[in-house]
A protein has these predicted regions:
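Catalytic histidine-centered segment of alpha/beta-hydrolase-like enzymes
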Residues: 246-259
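Gly/Ala-rich beta-loop-alpha elbow adjacent to hydrolase catalytic centers
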Residues: 106, 110, 114
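Flexible "cap/lid" loop of the alpha/beta hydrolase fold
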Residues: 115-119, 125-157
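Conserved HGGG/HGGXW glycine-rich cap/lid loop of the alpha/beta-hydrolase fold
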Residues: 19-72
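Short beta-strand immediately N-terminal to the catalytic nucleophile in serine-hydrolase-like folds
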Residues: 104-106, 131
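Conserved acidic catalytic loop of the alpha/beta-hydrolase fold
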Residues: 84-102
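Conserved alpha/beta-hydrolase catalytic His-Asp/Glu region
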Residues: 140, 155-211
Length: 269
């Protein structure tokens, strides 16, 4: 039995500062405000594909793509991948599709990428849902392992990282770990993690996040309710969305509530 296509899947060639990319994208068109989704480290564009099964989002165009070093996207030089390159990739994807203003959703690495994108071009962003993206040094519980569990061999580091993640107590950690080796190129790990740590420690991310002039939501799993800054950012106008029965991965542990909170913020914009 054939089924109507929920979205279009394609690859688009881009050149970012001399790095050749073939970016794997899923997208659809529509009359309403578009949504740009940025996935986290170890995830892919498919984290957001089920937007097409959520009736409240009917009519909204969306774009989700595999970041360089991840999923089906091809990259000519994995060693060049860092957060600034990921930001430029997002800008190039938006340009390719002719998107001017948009709602922004980013998870983890994608949340940090989204923050830097929004900081550079705040006039283009209608709203920002930051799903446990880095806004403070304490958010580097995954990426800081590049320093805390240092290995000279990147393949050995990544293998050990996967095993630590598989045994972690956070909800959905084992599920996440099971596909890490298939979704991330080993050669991209160090550059991404070191860039995330450097920005979290030295990039004034909290100041950037709080200065954004549009509706913002910080979504987090209940197991991360200990984050020290939550009450402070709420007092400064950030909407908090705590997801029960969930850790770092609401799209795996509680997707229904994740979608509800995303829509609630976008309706405020």
């Amino acid at each position: 039995m054939s089924h109507p296509a929920r979205f279009t899947r394609e690859k688009i060639p881009l050149n970012i500062d001399g790095v050749q990319l073939d970016v794997a994208v899923i997208h659809r068109s529509g009359p309403k405000a578009p949504i740009l989704f940025l996935h986290g480290f170890g995830s892919t564009k498919e984290d957001y594909a089920d937007i097409t099964l959520q009736p409240p989002f009917d009519g909204h165009p969306f774009i989700a793509y595999d970041a360089p070093g991840c999923g089906e996207t091809e990259c000519s030089d994995l060693s060049r991948i860092d957060i600034p390159l990921l930001v430029k990739t997002a800008q190039a994807v938006l340009k390719h599709f002719g998107i001017d203003t948009f709602h922004l959703v980013g998870h983890s690495m994608g949340g940090l990428t989204g923050l830097m994108l929004a900081h550079e071009e705040p006039e283009r962003v209608l709203s920002f849902v930051d799903i446990e993206g880095n806004i403070a040094p304490e958010d580097c519980f995954l990426s800081r392992q590049i320093h805390d569990h240092r290995r000279e061999d990147d393949a050995r580091f990544f293998k050990d990282f996967i095993e630590r993640t598989r045994l972690a107590s956070d909800p959905a950690s084992a599920l996440y770990a099971a596909s890490l080796a298939h979704k991330v190129r080993t050669g991209a790990v160090r550059g991404i993690f070191e860039s995330m740590v450097d920005l979290s420690d030295n990039g004034q991310l909290m100041d950037k996040f709080l200065a954004l002039p549009f509706p913002r939501q910080y979504m987090y799993g209940v197991t991360n309710s200990h984050l020290s800054y939550l009450s402070d950012i709420a007092a400064q106008g950030v909407h908090l969305a705590c997801i029960p029965d969930c850790g770092h991965f609401p799209m795996y542990s509680n997707p229904k509530l994740m979608w509800q909170h995303i829509k609630a913020l976008q309706d405020r914009a």
